[in-house]
Regions:
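Extended, well-ordered alpha-helical scaffold segments
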Residues: 21-41, 143, 147, 154-174, ...
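Well-ordered alpha-helical scaffold segments within catalytic/enzyme domains
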Residues: 5-22, 138-157, 205-215, 259-274
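Short amphipathic alpha-helical segments
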Residues: 257-261, 273-281, 290
């Protein structure tokens, strides 16, 4: 899978549609499809039914080589994988890409899941890598809320009720990932039951969900703090952490899609000053480096 942005995207597109009635039937079909996708997450990645879903491969989060995964990744073997040739390093600087050791583990997981026939009833518990990512869950929460609101508008009451229920439970459970010490949300290693001490942008992305205002304010302050150490907002990892790498993919560099979602969440929380800084920095980054 990939981050579940579809519910948010569909509602945003529908709101901007010049003639909603013309596309209503198509939108209803998409609402049904996204509702089934959301159900898949909670059925297959939330075995304890606590409202938080796990990723079982770093690729699913879209933040492939984040520091967030290092601890849990140590449990993934590298022995016995098939020979492979990487294509990504042929068109990108290898120093900017995940390491060979990380790729070995990526592929071990893929081959392991394939050996299980991609049976979703088995994959979660069979994976040595089970991480609850606050950013991933925030996206799912936001998409559930947005899909529910859209379904309500279209009088698809069952879909609306179901997605509101998922979103509210998940939003409440998201608080289990908050760290007063780190002043942000952290990933949870579901195998050990421990929070992962990694100050990544994944914990800041929680503001994309409608978290309570005090938490949003704390994240805005945290973003201001870590961005002060960089030329542009928002680094994908805390520059004060020794594991920060300014050039390597998700261990330091700025990602505009993350800036977009965090900015959207800050605007929704009426934190205009913080969101304006992110927009200004993003535009300056595009101006200096291209898009």
């Amino acid at each position: 899978t990939q981050p579940p942005v579809a519910g948010f995207v569909l509602r945003r597109l529908y709101q901007r549609c010049a003639d909603p009635e013309e596309v209503e039937e198509r939108v209803e079909d998409l609402v049904d499809a996204i509702d089934r996708w959301h159900a898949w997450f909670f059925e297959n990645r939330d075995p304890q039914r606590d409202g938080l879903v796990s990723i079982i491969h770093p690729w699913e989060a879209g933040r492939d080589n984040s520091v967030d995964w290092d601890q849990a990744f140590e449990r993934v073997p590298t022995e016995g994988i098939s020979e492979y040739t990487r294509r990504d390093t042929e068109h990108a600087n290898p120093e900017h890409r995940p390491t060979k050791e990380q790729y070995d583990r990526y592929l071990w997981l893929v081959e392991h899941f394939r050996s299980l026939g991609w049976d979703n009833s088995k994959l979660h518990d069979a994976s040595p890598f089970q991480v609850v990512d606050p950013g991933f869950n925030a996206i799912l929460i936001r998409s559930c809320f947005d899909l529910a609101a859209l379904a309500e508008e279209l009088e698809m009451d069952d879909v609306a009720h179901r997605n509101y229920a998922w979103a509210r439970q998940s939003l409440e459970s998201l608080e289990d990932l908050w760290s007063d010490q780190h002043r942000q949300y952290l990933c949870l290693d579901r195998t050990t039951g421990q929070l992962i001490e990694s100050n990544s942008v994944g914990g800041l992305l929680a503001v994309f969900a409608p978290i309570r205002h005090g938490r949003a304010q704390a994240l805005a302050q945290r973003i201001e703090q870590i961005s002060a150490e960089c030329r542009f907002s928002i680094p994908s990892h805390d520059p004060a952490d020794s594991r920060f790498d300014a050039k390597r993919y998700w261990r330091g560099p700025v990602w505009l899609i993350i800036n977009y979602m965090i900015n959207d969440g800050l605007e929704a929380a009426s934190l205009a000053e913080s969101s304006t800084k992110i927009v200004d920095d993003s535009l300056q980054l595009i101006g200096s480096s291209g898009f």
